[in-house]
């Protein structure tokens, strides 16, 4: 079977039409090195088009899933996304405008022959009911796993004599990368519109070995892909891994991952949802440009960094944190937590607030000027209540004019979610006004953030009516 799929990838020519147009977009000295892998990716694109009915069947919802989706859509807040001057949009939007997104795997990846071959095998097995014992990845972790790791680190400064294996950041059309180390100098493109930290982090995530979060084999337990809302020709961008090839290091599904596309990605029209989270309060969190705690934790697991800290000599981290591999006496903490052991409010602006039985106001303003900035400003608040009580947090006035997938320009993160290692619920749309969240404990971290103009958020909070037993 493996040889059969490899032949399929190699016999398809790329001598005309869209394939030639895309290859012609790649310029300069990197063209020769990219040619082979780009051909493989473009051939995969063509095969996926031929597999159209199979891909559509993969995305078809069972009656139970369809019923559940209808119930969720009745309750969800339909967000009208803002058009913001100076914002180039999400990666899939940037690459669509650049004319390359449809042809790259899942919109921004160039694949090796082995990776492309396994994707076709996944589709065959998913649609035929077969299964094979293949090596797992999530982070891409195939039989050549050790060769895909950057064992000596990544050379990210301009020193061409340091190592033969290195990343070369180029300004070609679109935002794209290889997945994992391919040997020698490999390119990562940050073209027009991609010059943002969050986009760069996403593409570096691919280069270091990560696929997209929404392609996890278990994604259907966390999001519903709405096939009818996906634009023509883009269904194959929503294929997923299989249990035989997908390894997630024991981490749960991360809605706030920088490797997750937005809930409106590849939609037929701007405000149609293509990915509906099972927890509807995560709708605006999908598509983040902020590196999540789980992203950091998983990358450290992938590269074995945590082994540097021996448990008996390392910090005893609280709230799900883990010892920093470069300073084992301190912890890397989930969002909303700080200090050496993750048991303090992060330093800087914000405050500790005490909830009572009456509604109290939290108003926060961040930012300056009118332009989009590279770096975020953050403020961290802790809302506390007595032991065994819960906290209610109401959004009174959300930020104005910044409603985009992932709330990647400004917003508020409210951590009423049960697992505090995961990203909290993020909000940035006017439709969020009036929404009330209830915590699972007597502490709610609230993180406000901004990197465009000035935004204000107003919340109210009080002790909830229910008590934790």
Locate the predicted segments by residue:
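Long, disordered, Ser/Thr/Pro-rich
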Residues: 18, 22, 143-145, 267-282, ...
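Acidic, Ser/Thr-rich intrinsically disordered and amphipathic helical segments
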Residues: 5, 68, 199-203, 254, ...
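Metalloprotease/metallohydrolase-associated module, dominated by Zn2+-dependent proteases
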Residues: 219-332, 338-340, 344-347
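Sec-dependent signal peptide recognition
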Residues: 1-7
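Domain-level representation of secreted and single-pass membrane ectodomains enriched
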Residues: 308-469
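Metzincin-family zinc-dependent endopeptidase catalytic domain
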Residues: 126-140, 148-149, 159-268, 376, ...
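Disordered inhibitory propeptide/activation segment of secreted metzincin zinc metalloprotease zymogens
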Residues: 2, 13-161, 270-273
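Divalent metal-coordination and catalytic microenvironments
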Residues: 156, 205, 259, 299, ...
């Amino acid at each position: 079977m493996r040889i059969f799929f490899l032949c399929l990838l190699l016999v398809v020519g790329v001598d005309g039409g869209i394939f030639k147009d895309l290859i012609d977009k790649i310029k300069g000295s990197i063209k020769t090195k990219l040619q082979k892998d780009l051909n493989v990716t473009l051939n995969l694109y063509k095969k996926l088009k031929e597999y159209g009915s199979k891909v559509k069947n993969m995305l078809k919802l069972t009656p139970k899933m369809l019923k559940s989706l209808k119930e969720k859509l009745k309750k969800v807040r339909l967000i009208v996304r803002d058009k913001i001057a100076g914002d180039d949009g999400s990666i899939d939007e940037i690459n669509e405008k650049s004319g390359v997104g449809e042809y790259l795997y899942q919109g921004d990846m160039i694949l090796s022959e082995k990776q492309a071959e396994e994707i076709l095998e996944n589709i065959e097995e998913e649609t035929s009911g077969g299964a094979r014992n293949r090596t797992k990845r999530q982070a891409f972790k195939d039989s050549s796993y050790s060769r895909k790791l950057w064992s000596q680190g990544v050379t990210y400064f301009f020193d061409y004599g340091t190592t033969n294996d290195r990343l070369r950041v180029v300004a070609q059309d679109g935002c794209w990368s290889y997945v994992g180390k391919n040997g020698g100098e490999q390119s990562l493109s940050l073209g027009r519109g991609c010059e943002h930290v969050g986009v760069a982090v996403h593409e570096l995530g691919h280069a270091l070995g990560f696929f997209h979060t929404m392609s996890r084999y278990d994604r259907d337990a966390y999001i519903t892909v709405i096939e009818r809302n996906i634009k023509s020709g883009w269904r194959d961008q929503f294929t997923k891994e299989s249990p035989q090839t997908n390894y997630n290091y024991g981490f749960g599904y991360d809605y706030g991952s920088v490797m997750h596309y937005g809930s409106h990605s590849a939609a037929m029209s701007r405000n149609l949802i293509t990915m509906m989270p099972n927890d509807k309060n995560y709708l605006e969190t999908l598509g983040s440009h902020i590196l999540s705690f789980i992203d950091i934790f998983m990358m450290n697991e992938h590269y074995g960094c945590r082994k540097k800290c021996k448990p008996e000599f390392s910090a005893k981290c609280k709230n799900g944190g883990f010892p920093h591999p470069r300073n084992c006496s301190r912890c890397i903490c989930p969002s909303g937590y700080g200090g050496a052991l993750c048991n303090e409010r992060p330093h800087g602006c914000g405050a500790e607030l005490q909830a009572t039985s009456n509604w109290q106001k939290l108003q926060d303003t961040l930012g300056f000027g009118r332009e989009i900035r590279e770096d975020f400003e953050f403020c961290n608040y802790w809302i506390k209540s007595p032991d065994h009580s819960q906290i209610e947090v109401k959004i009174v006035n959300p930020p104005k004019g910044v409603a985009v997938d992932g709330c990647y320009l400004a917003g508020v993160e409210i951590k009423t979610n049960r697992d505090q290692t995961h990203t909290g619920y993020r909000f940035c749309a006017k439709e969020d006004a009036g929404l009330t969240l209830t915590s699972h404990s007597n502490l709610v971290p609230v993180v406000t953030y901004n990197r465009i103009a000035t935004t204000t958020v107003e919340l109210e909070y009080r002790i909830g009516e229910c008590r934790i037993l």
